[in-house]
Structure formats: C-alpha cells, structure tokens
Amino acid sequence: NHLSGNDKLAQKQENANLDDNLGQASVAAIKQYLQLAAEQKLDIDAICQTIGLDKKLLSDNSQHISGQLFQQLIAALLAQSSDELFGLHTAKHVQPGSYSVLGYISMNCANLGQVISKIQPFEKLVGDMGVTTFSPLGEQVKISWHCQFTDPNVKRHMVDNCLASWLTFARYLVSHDSNPSELRLSRQQPSLSQQQEYQAVFNCLVRYGQSENAIIFDKALLSLPLNKGDQKLLSTLESHAQSLVYNLTTEVDLATQLRIELEKSLKTGAFHQQDMAEKFGISAKTLQRRLAALGLNFQSLLDETRLAMAKKHLAQSVLNLNQISSE
C-alpha cells in the first residue's frame, strides 16, 4: 500500500464519515448483546466507560444511542470475549421487546406472512443497523438482511445475531419447530465445530462465502397461524409505531438541519447552543435533550461541522491557510 500521508488521512476521514452515518440503535436491540456479555462475565461497566456510553440510558428501552456507539460497543465486547460465535449466541436472549414496538406488533399478527410484511415499515424502530428485503423464489421465499455497519468483524456477528434471532423469534411466535430450507452467509466457511453450531441453531443446509446473508424457507410457512394474535391490539400498536417512526425521522432531520445552520452561523459568529436553539424556536435545554435522544451532543456536532468545513476548504485549495484559520 503506497498511499501518501495526505491520502491516508483522507481515507481515514472518509471512514470516519461513514461511521458518522450509521444512524441510531434502540436500547432494546442492545440488550441481547449485554445479556450474553453478563452471562460470560465480561466487564460491562468498564467497556461502557471506555467508549463513553452512559449506562443509565440502557435501563430505558425507548431510548436510542448512535449507531457508531453501538458498533464500538460490540467491537469492545468482542475484544473481551473469547466466544468466536458471540453474535450467534446472542439469539437465545431474543424476546418481543428486543424488536421494540415491532416485536409486540409481530405477536399480534394473524400469521407469519403478516409478521414479515411489518418488518420493512417499522424496522427503523429497532435501529438503522441494516435493511431487510423479502423476495419470492418459486415455491420458496427469501428474507435477507444487509448490515450497514462498517467494521467487518462487528458486521459478521450482527448478521449472525439478526438471522438467528429472526428464526428463534419466529419459532416462538408459531410454537412450531419448522426449519428453513437453506441459510446463506457471506462469511467464509468456519471450522468444523463452528459449522456444527450453525447447524444446531438453523437445522438446515448452510452455504458459506455467499453474496448475501439470507434465510430461505417454504412459502407454506407464511400461512402458519400465530398462537397469540389480537387484531384489535395490532391496529393500536401500528398507530403508535407510525408516530414513533415519524418522530425518529423528524429528530434525524433536526440533526441535519442543525448541521446546515451551524455551517451558516460559523461564518457570522452566532453559533452557540443558545443561538441555535432560538433559530429552532426551542430552549437550549430542549435542544440538548433532543440531541441526547439521538446519541449526539451540541459540542461534537459543532466540532464535526468545523472539521467538515475545513476539509471542504482544503479540497477547494483556493483558500490559503490564513483564510481557513480566520474562520
């Protein structure tokens, strides 16, 4: 690798920008990882302290942290655990609450097909860790998940967590030990003992080194009735979930709008938290609270915006260093 110092810096900044775009993760989604970590006697307090995660947040399932922080948390857990299949083993801790309101919506659907139809509209409530796609394959169907995280090791464990949790939760919903036809994993073929572990969880043909991460199963399973469904409760939960998705999207827009306003205001000098809150017609405290709910804080957004502007100026290379420092 013959990258110059400047190229390496640019690449590092590009990766940092990618990490900044990891969205959010619900506290509910984090719990599975922490339950396995506690079972393995990992030092969760020390890990949270190292990455700057406030443990108080973790007691409220309605809260969110940034995707970047979630990725750091999983990386830190993996570094401390000797479990090569940590992600796969988290699936045993899945419960309706792991999927936020989506979990309770799923419980009140009529059948498995209806459950799957609810994933895409509401998966944002669980977090922005990945995107689910669902496609027919003749007499079979394929449900695949594309992880949006950037750390390859974290991604592998997240994929295992996601697919194994889906299957474990689906079996719980229908009280029926149906097995998929095939599991496709992008990871390379692991050791024989690890292959046996995948086999024990999924109980089907497992293909490694694939171009996607997906579960394939018979179409007939979509009509399996759920043993716990309540259609009246379902519509109430869906209305609630729709308003939560709307609020989450609005809050993400707040962060984007704030970045835009900061960029404008850095040129005028009125860029303090109080100034920004006034622009949005809210108090500084409210702004602080809404940013905290996104796993963000005002100072880090200000620093990021300054850095982005400096990089933009450097890229244009028409401004000399004196002009940059004066801003």
Enumerate the language-model features and the residues they cover.
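Short acidic/histidine-centered micro-motifs embedded in hydrophobic/aromatic stretches
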Residues: 50-54, 186, 327
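N-terminal low-complexity or simple alpha-helical regulatory segments
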Residues: 1-143, 179
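Hydrophobic alpha-helical core bundles mediating ligand binding, dimerization, or RNAP-core interactions
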Residues: 74, 116, 163-166, 262
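Short hinge/gating elements
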Residues: 100-106, 148-152, 222-223, 243-245
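DNA-contacting interfaces and partner/effector-binding or oligomerization modules
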Residues: 131, 135-224
